[in-house]
């Protein structure tokens, strides 16, 4: 929303983003499931010989990188791309990076497309994927017990990042809230309400979060943490009460942290610490 305010309109915002493809020499890599980006590539003024290379989390077509069952494949940079594909890595390989989410798969496919466009050997790409690790507090699995996963995405300090987290799991106990800095959560809550098995609301601007949940997720159990101290102790305890086997307790606050924590890392560390302490007591 702030980007749109800055640029004045969606069209101006889109035009600015599209400049990344201008004068491309080798390959315009784009998500085939994003029609706006595909249009940017179609309209881009590129150098002769530059190719449009799509990536997807699904089955790749010709000139695309994607997944055939559990294998990351290249169907763009080989001679017989009409009838065959090059294996790059498996989904099991990608689990070494972090929690296997749709956007992790998409990022791996995009990185593969970029690397292959410059002739990097498939074996070298696989080796790089096996070595790569996400930074802490980015959809990081903290613990798993009794069929319940506890995931730290404290780095999700805005609705866009929180949406990527919520989109990664089917049933979520959502730890949300903090310093909203004027951001409206109504669209986010409305879009992902059907994935919520519960919500734990923290932060100094809880009222706005509670109102969005009441409006768009009326049947979702909500617990407000109003205690000024030991916020994560009470939050994790509340999540334990709500969570059932198959649920993911997800810290993806969609807000900044400095109202109750030093920073997002402190928030994530306190979450992880309380999860481990309280799960040991079971």
Task: Indicate where each model-derived feature is located.
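ATP-dependent carboxylate-amine ligase
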Residues: 114-123, 127-137, 141-282
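Acidic, Mg2+-coordinating active-site environments of NTP-dependent enzymes
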Residues: 1-149
């Amino acid at each position: 929303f702030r980007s749109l305010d800055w640029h004045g309109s969606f069209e101006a915002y889109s035009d600015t983003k599209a400049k990344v493809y201008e004068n491309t020499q080798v390959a315009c890599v784009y998500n085939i499931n994003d029609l706006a980006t595909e249009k940017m590539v179609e309209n881009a003024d590129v150098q002769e010989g530059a190719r449009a290379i799509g990536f997807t989390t699904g089955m790749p077509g010709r000139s695309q990188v994607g997944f055939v069952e559990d294998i990351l494949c290249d169907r763009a940079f080989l001679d017989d791309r009409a009838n065959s594909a090059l294996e790059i890595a498996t989904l099991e390989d990608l689990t070494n990076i972090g929690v296997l989410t749709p956007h992790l798969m998409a990022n791996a496919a995009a990185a593969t497309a970029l690397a292959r466009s410059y002739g990097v050997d498939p074996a070298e790409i696989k080796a790089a994927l096996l070595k790569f690790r996400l930074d802490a507090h980015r959809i990081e699995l903290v613990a798993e017990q009794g069929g319940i996963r506890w995931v730290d995405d404290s780095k999700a300090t805005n609705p866009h990042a929180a949406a990527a987290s919520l989109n990664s799991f089917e049933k979520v106990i959502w730890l949300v809230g903090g310093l909203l800095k004027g951001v409206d959560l109504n669209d986010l809550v409305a879009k992902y309400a059907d994935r919520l098995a519960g919500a734990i609301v923290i932060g100094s601007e809880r009222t706005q979060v509670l109102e969005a949940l009441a409006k768009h997720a009326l049947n979702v159990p909500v617990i407000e943490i109003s205690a000024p101290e030991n916020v994560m102790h009470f939050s994790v305890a509340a999540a334990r009460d709500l969570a059932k086997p198959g649920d993911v307790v997800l810290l993806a606050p969609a807000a900044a942290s400095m109202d109750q924590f030093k920073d997002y890392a402190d928030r994530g560390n306190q979450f992880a610490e309380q999860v481990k302490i309280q799960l040991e007591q079971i």
